[in-house]
Amino acid sequence: MPDAYPRYVIPPYILRRIVDRGSLQQQRCAQNTLSHVQTLMAHVPGRPAAPHVTTPGLLERDIYDAGQTQDLPGTQVRFEGQPSNGDVAVDEAYDYLGITHDFFWKSYQRDSLDNRGLKLTGSVHYGHEYQNAFWNGQQMVFGDGDGEIFNRFTIAIDVVAHELSHGVTESEAGLIYFEQSGALNESLSDVFGSLVKQYQRQQTADKADWIIGEGLLAKGIHGKGLRSMSQPGTAYDDPVLGKDPHPAHMKDFV
């Protein structure tokens, strides 16, 4: 899979809002995350080739624990077929990577993200109270959140699938991550994220909530998730996060 800029689930404008409106602790967590995001976006080092599986459709997962550091991938804590180690973030990452892989294989006969059998790797407990999750072109990375604004980033299958779907877009469309091209990139990931959640829940489109990030907002935050695809602009309205700014129609965007 080619080198790519990291794709983050929490955009910089939300982090800046927390820096402006949050408590001192919330501001610190958001600023640390924002600084990290800006650093990674400014410098994308080359990466070694990711491992692949030779049998079409065969699922292979590796889950690592970053130990609240920013060293990737971390310590391996679960591999394909290994039982749970009791860490909920590890189990969620393992399960949701698997469900996303199954969705693309069973629905589209797509052999992992790149259609060449890419092994799925995820690292949990990244950074200290890190308020984001991202796909770095080779693997998934999940922060734990701060527990005040965001819960752990493995909690929402649509977020996991959203980020993994950037790997599909990278290998197929090559959409430049800028302005409308970048918006299309994000939109495709939102669609696939919601479809994977529907696949997991065995829902039809009319029964789905079309919320991206269900469960991600911590208790006390006024919102259902990060975005609503059925009612854009209504996902959250909170004193710290502000109001969901997503337009419902193109005329509201231009």
Please report, for each region that a protein language model flagged, where it lies by residue.
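Zymogen propeptides/activation segments of proteases
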Residues: 1-158, 167-254
